[in-house]
């Protein structure tokens, strides 16, 4: 009987132990964000458009999953600049409920506007307009502009040859590193590649963001001499291949006319996070990237705005 009582007492002591004694306590990351009133206004003549691609070939607005590609297109009419800024999907941020989590999860839980608001307060910008699409729609858009010419490495060529893409989806068929003309489907597979470094050496998700920016800039370069009529036809195809936008018809036409007037302008590229400002962080068992947001806000401000205003 005494032995049974002793065992029961020991069991009670074990059950009374805090969970932190049985498992490693999750470290709470320090993430710096801005209050809404601290976000500086967008300079006159500059517009931001968030291009958001869902991680699906058949996304539905009433059941959106994870966001995969997130690229900010900035059109600066005053200074004649066009900029693409990409965001890695696994960066650790504060969600709209102020709980930490990966950027890719926000749309599923808080909607597209929740993602826009999150990017704004983490990076000190005022995104107002967005386009939402999925991978099949991106494929159709690339086909609508006539495909895209891309230079790939031997490593990328080897990976793409093993992937389920038709040899006829590039011209010529991929054999080794070199320059190829990609169809829409092949371009999507290329942009999603993460197992081999990109042309510039960037690995993993950072390499994926580089490939996306490269496709966008390559398309822009191919359209520098496009006629107005052809450009309008491409715009019609683009608008037929989006899930959603918060832009009115007037907004779209205004943006189109501005971009058309600036055709031929070199597309500048930027990536968040910048080198040396992020590290691997395990959050509840999943890999994420913990960033120095103050350093990234300053870098974005310096690149995009110069001395127009100060980002705290």
Which residues does each PLM region occupy?
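Amphipathic, coiled-coil-like alpha-helical scaffolding segments used for oligomerization/assembly
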Residues: 109-171, 248-249
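Extracytoplasmic
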Residues: 44-47, 65-70, 79-87, 98, ...
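Flexible, polar/acidic helix-loop-strand segments at domain edges
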Residues: 40-45, 143-230, 311
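Sec-dependent N-terminal signal peptides of Gram-positive bacterial secreted proteins and lipoproteins
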Residues: 3-23
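Soluble non-cytosolic domains of exported or imported proteins
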Residues: 63-67, 97, 105-114, 132-136, ...
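Second-shell loop/turn segments in exported
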Residues: 57-62, 100-109, 124-129, 177, ...
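C-terminal solvent-exposed extensions
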Residues: 27-40, 44-47, 59-60, 64, ...
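Extracytoplasmic/secreted envelope proteins and their assembly/folding machinery
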Residues: 67-69, 100, 112-120, 135-139, ...
